[in-house]
Amino acid sequence: MQMVISRSAVRDGLVAVAVVGSIALGAVGCAGGDDKAPKAGGEFVAGTLLCGGEAVSTEAAESLKVITGASRFEESDEDSTVEHAAKQLSQEFTSSVTGDGDICQVFAIDAVQSDRLEVTWELTGGPPEGEPAPKFTVLRMGERALAAPDAGVVQFACRNEKLLGSQPAHVDVGVERWSPKEPEGDPEKLKDAYATVAHSVSLAMAKELGCENNGGLQARPSLDPA
């Protein structure tokens, strides 16, 4: 049984878990059919073409293979892009310093409905505070990055007076596995993989938002613990 952690809980160092078991999967089944059936989709593409084609670097695509064991994935929907998410985020920031939304979902070839990666964004209202949950390793990227064997988060401050006004937007980009199975593989390699994917999407988001200095994110991920 896989335990998933909310974005706010990760940021605040609180472990708020939802058990993906028979009840949760039953809810998915009611909404979208048999969760154990193969995901009905269209074309399958390389990892670098996911989430709009600008979000996943070659290095991050290799990391997706470490996480899922696959190198081909269901093509993302038209609105499941960094460009679309950045527009949502900037619109949300004009009325509130907090909010969240989806960027895209990643289904490996032959994946079932209940086994996916969710890539999300969140406006946190301020820089990171407190200690993260024990499962996470803190990395030096942006304001703070967190890596676990089943999730990665990069937190950065975005300054763009034309788009966002005088106050910086504090953005979390998260990559999390929702699955009935426990993570498989070397935990440290999985941590690096999640951090790499989260960094790649975060950098794409920072560029799309026009953040000053790309939100403090470098061209490649920093995987050494802080």
Give the residues covered by each predicted segment.
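Bacterial N-terminal signal peptides that target proteins for export
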Residues: 2-17
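C-terminal motif of bacterial Sec signal peptides marking the signal peptidase cleavage site
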Residues: 26-29
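Bacterial signal peptide processing site
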Residues: 31-34
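A small/polar (G/S/T-enriched), proline-flanked helix-loop surface module common
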Residues: 39-203, 207, 213-226
